């Protein structure tokens, strides 16, 4: 079976199962599932799987593979292999997910300037990213290493057209001592930022927060390859849809403007549709963008201040991607039944003098 046929069959099968509300091996075009003796993944006859990364496995840099793998992307390596950059959504109190081992015994093997937050040597950031080099011909892992160290709660993010991964911290925490998850937690740095990881890096990148992209509980990012604008989601009940306009297309540390989406004809639109249908399904609405100030705040209130400025409110913005001049995003608990919403933002480049999509429509 060709890959395209497999994907089409799997998709159609999934749609039929969803429509019928049942899951049955008789309805599958691939046959009955066979029990996996390792109790990891049951597959039909003729299918197999390969584990290329496993929590607590020893990596090539001498550190352990962190737990809680989350958002990731694959990049073409210069040698023909594939580099997979993977987030790890870990809290610093969760020592058992750490790359440094449970007692931080491996922490001294990493240069201090490559650890964003060492947590005074007690509770370093246990999130960050790992990079896996994979040989698609031999179907095996070549090497794996930490590529971003000392951050926390790295949830989703997004790949850039210039070959990097934007790793998003889904948290908002401050330096100091606190008691979390029944443990004393020490932090040296502020968290709630986006970090850029070069997918070709053979070791950890210097961890530099992109402060111009805002400090809030980041979820995911999608890059408009034409303009370089970056769209950002926020996983909160009262979240905004953000847009970052970089001063230089592929140099995010050079700063830029952070904005939030607003409905042109109704200020502070609540798109959640919890109490009433403010936004009708399938109907296009003209939008504009509101410039935000104090984007690196001391309080986790950027979304609240943006709403007061007229920005639209979303119900837990999460997944986001760019395709064919549009940006698609999901709101996890939107809608009357709180089962989720999908939005499409159509970029209108004709009204833009700087090709940044200064106006557009959303449905």
What positions do the PLM features span?
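Twin-arginine (Tat) signal peptide motif
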Residues: 1-7
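Conserved small-residue
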Residues: 9-18, 23-318, 322-363
